[in-house]
Amino acid sequence: MSAFIGSWKLCESQNFDEFLRELGVNFFIRKAASTSKPTITFDKFGDNGLKMKTETILKTTEQSFTFGEEFDETTIDGRQVKSTVTRDSDTQLTQVQKHDDGNTVIVRKIEGDMMVTTATFKNITSVRKYQRH
């Protein structure tokens, strides 16, 4: 878990606009999100969780969660979802967001000084890479 603690700045993004389109995100938010370079900061939360802060040009969001426990989340584009984050290993987290249209699965994996985030909804997958900041 400590591998995630700190700040991460987006440095590479693949298929993100298509992923957001599949989720039903409107054109203007998609365009702003696709050009944004968000920073994600992780801090420890309790004995078995994390606090995740995402800062973009659109807005800043924060979620605190305990691994394995469902929580209410407002996504960066304003959707209300039920999320659960599990710790697969010290260097990998899997988040499942449940919403009206199905489930989005987000896997975050630490690879050296990079965090690779793979998000999948239906048949569309986006990969975003973040550099430790």
From Swiss-Prot:
Keyword Transport: yes
Keyword Heme in record: no
GO molecular function (one): lipid binding
Keyword tags: Lipid-binding, Transport
Stored InterPro entries: Calycin (IPR012674), Fatty_acid-bd (IPR000463), ILBP (IPR031259), Lipocln_cytosolic_FA-bd_dom (IPR000566)
CDD domains cross-referenced by the UniProt entry: FABP (cd00742)
One Pfam match: Lipocalin
Family the UniProt entry places it in: Belongs to the calycin superfamily. Fatty-acid binding protein (FABP) family.
Name of the protein in its database record: Fatty acid-binding protein
Record organism: Clonorchis sinensis (Chinese liver fluke)
Taxonomic placement: Eukaryota, Metazoa, Spiralia, Lophotrochozoa, Platyhelminthes
